[in-house]
Amino acid sequence: MKEHSSATRQPRAPLSSTRTGPAWGLLGVAAFSLTVPLTRITVAEGGMSPLFVASARAVVATFLAATALLVTRQPLPRGRQWIRLGVVAAGVVAGFPLLTSFALTMTSAGHSAVVIALLPAATAVLAVLRTEERPPRAFWWAAATGAVAAVGFAVFHGGGFAGLQWPDLLLFGAVVAAAAAYAEGGLLARELGPWQTISWALVLSAPLMAVLSGIAVAAQPLTASPAQWASFAYLGVVSMFLGFLAWYRGLAYGPMAQVSQIQLVQPVLTLGWAALLLGESLTLSTALGALAVIACAGGAVRTRLARPTPDAASPLGSGVLRRGSVPPPERVSGATARRGAAPGAPEQRSDPAPASADR
């Protein structure tokens, strides 16, 4: 009986998973919200080239990641996990930083928020395609409304699109790259661990990023100011490493599609930081748009919290009963098993509870 009761207890799991995922996701978004304004500062006035900012910050983060992996003696990823880590590295270590760094030499932080506001919707779509998560209809309504509100107020704040320009194409590419990396990284975080996922992605891309950093310095010597170096330090330590620890942990707790919608708040925070650090105007219409985006993001997340699914019982997604999978043995025990037993057969032979308790 002791073995039975201890195996069937599930303390705090549903509450922890449904609340912890969005909380970690919000922490990651708060860290990322400074990335665009600080990148704009680093590439301003030619103090650092966009190639150096994008590649060298990955080198800084790789040093932290490699140290953490060595100190904790993490096992190496296996087989196809390396390929999936390549997707993460291509998206958030190389693709997003490079594309946004070059775009921000030609446009403002406020204008960049126009396209980056599409990232949550892109992540949600790729998460649904990549996994078997099926959000309720209310989630999609809230997500779509939030995306429209985010793009609408960001376009108005940034002065709108004067046709499709080169910086916009770079930012669209950055959104696609980051969304693919977020979706794949969220799944890998369930297998490798949240901080291990971004750490191995950084290590995998380190040789390429180091070469690009050297090329960037040779092509354009560094003449950065102290403020630019401070901004670069944040990009390397927080935006490239610590922020992903929180973000991938949130995606691992999941569900991924709902947690991704917390990013709808990021353009609001980004424009706030742009107003504070870069002197960009923050109007009443921007404040009202920010409230609309936050309300929609909260509504999307609450659709998950209000109706827990089997995935909520496992913080890292283990034990989820997927479509077409075989139910656990305990579901077919008892009366169901006795119906198929021969008359007079002993009942205890059809009770698999002790075996299933070990699972």
What does each model-identified segment do?
Residues K2-A7, E45-G95, A122-L126, V176-E184, ...:
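Transmembrane alpha-helices of multi-pass small-molecule transport proteins
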Residues S17-P22, G46-S55, P77-I83, V155-A177, ...:
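Juxtamembrane helix-entry segments on the extracytoplasmic side of multipass membrane proteins
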Residues G25, V29, S55-A56, V93, ...:
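Helix-helix packing/entry segments at the starts of transmembrane helices
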Residues L34, L38-I41, E45, V60-G79, ...:
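Membrane-interface helix-cap regions at the ends of transmembrane helices
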